Amino acid sequence: MNVRPATNEDTNDIFWLLMEMAKENTSREVSVSGTVDEIRRVTGMGGCIVAEKDATIVASAGISPQSPWFTDEVFLGDSWFYVHPDHRVSDAAAKMKKSLQQFAKNAGKDLVLAVHSTDNAERKNKFFARDMELM
């Protein structure tokens, strides 16, 4: 599994991956333009990564500066963190998390990753909490 920074050329593949994520997590209509804009925004900031297997993007994560309403502190938080179901037994998630941790460390920011679905939420929380500070 190869994890690398995303480029604008990856936008289409990331978009379709996020459509899979949306199918799993919401019944709401997904905004095509909003999704593409978010992918491009995060990619342009250098905060989007992809995991590839055999030259196919099978996972992606996007982080950007965020701040909760209760503090002025800025951290790097995820807009998405998704591994295609066919690749969830791979090391894609672990490699992406490690890559994002290094990105945040280099930026001098804390990294906050959230669980965006209720499916297997406890397992996902444990994965994100492992070797990361919880907020």
What label would you give each PLM region?
Residues V115-H116, E133-M135:
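Conserved catalytic-core motifs of GNAT/GCN5-like acyltransferases
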Residues I39-V50:
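A short helix-loop-beta-strand connector motif used in the catalytic cores of GNAT acetyltransferases and
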Residues M1-V30:
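Short amphipathic alpha-helix that is part of the acyltransferase structural core
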Residues V112-K124:
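Conserved beta-strand-loop-alpha-helix junction that forms the acyl-donor binding cleft
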Residues S67-D78, M135:
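A conserved beta-turn-beta hairpin within the catalytic core of GNAT-like acetyltransferases
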Residues V50, T56-P65:
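Conserved beta-strand in the GNAT
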Residues K95-D110:
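Conserved acyl-CoA
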Residues S79-S90:
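A short, internal acetyl-CoA/4′-phosphopantetheine-binding micro-motif in the GNAT/acyltransferase core
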